[in-house]
Amino acid sequence: MHFLFLLFSFFTFLPINDKGLCNLNNTAFNAGEKISYTIYYNVIGLYVNAGKTDFTVQSTSFNDNDAFTFTAIGKSNSKYDWIFKVRDRYESVVDAKTLLPYQFTRQINEGSFHKKEMVKFNQKARTASTEEEVYKTSECTFDVVSAIYAARNFNYSNLAINDKIYLNFFLDKSLYPSYFKYLGREVITTKYGKFEVIKLAPLLLKGSMFEGGEKMTIWVTDDENHIPVRIETPIVVGSIKVDMVGYQNIRYPLSSLIELVNN
């Protein structure tokens, strides 16, 4: 199980309303944004700081089209590098208007496992191309990184409890359809502070680390930024918690923040 995939696993199964994201407008973030997270692992009732990841947004161009570059960099806690060293980088270049990906790359360095991959998307032809093969996709296909930012632009205001919302994404040579379930609104306290949040439960595919089903919970800020501030999920051994611990250059004031936690 790849380190950043612990984080992406919930985002990649954050599917989007079939009415919406083929023609979305970005209203949730600006170029220059940076969101930082700490990943905690719990195996015997005690959460251990296992690593961190940063998500950034930059303006760019791709084939003379205005674009964004989304980058996620994950690192294991240096205290545990001698056990299992992780240095991962995921990057997606997307159309600035639709947020659909042009190109997705990832560099995985985890212990003795190393992998580099590039996928080029043709949204009109509905294909995803690697060095080895061209794969058929579907209308509005995202990669794991672009799906995060697309989901932040979804309008949650008209959902009823247990509504399901759908998205297609391409990963590891396969196209995945899935959904997430809207569970309502509440207030939670994270490592950063107390927030008004939107609560979501994505459908996870069964894998080596996850049991599958709707066992993961995600909380995103109940404001125009829609920033994920906490993720919790059981895994085969123990559980994982991911908390937002910092941000820079967000598009709107963080109006969902009720109070900061004194660290």
Roles of regions detected by a PLM:
Residues 3-12:
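Sec-dependent N-terminal signal peptides
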Residues 16-121, 159-263:
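Acidic, serine/threonine-rich low-complexity disordered tracts
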Residues 113-156:
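Hydrophobic, well-structured mid-protein blocks that either form specific transmembrane helices
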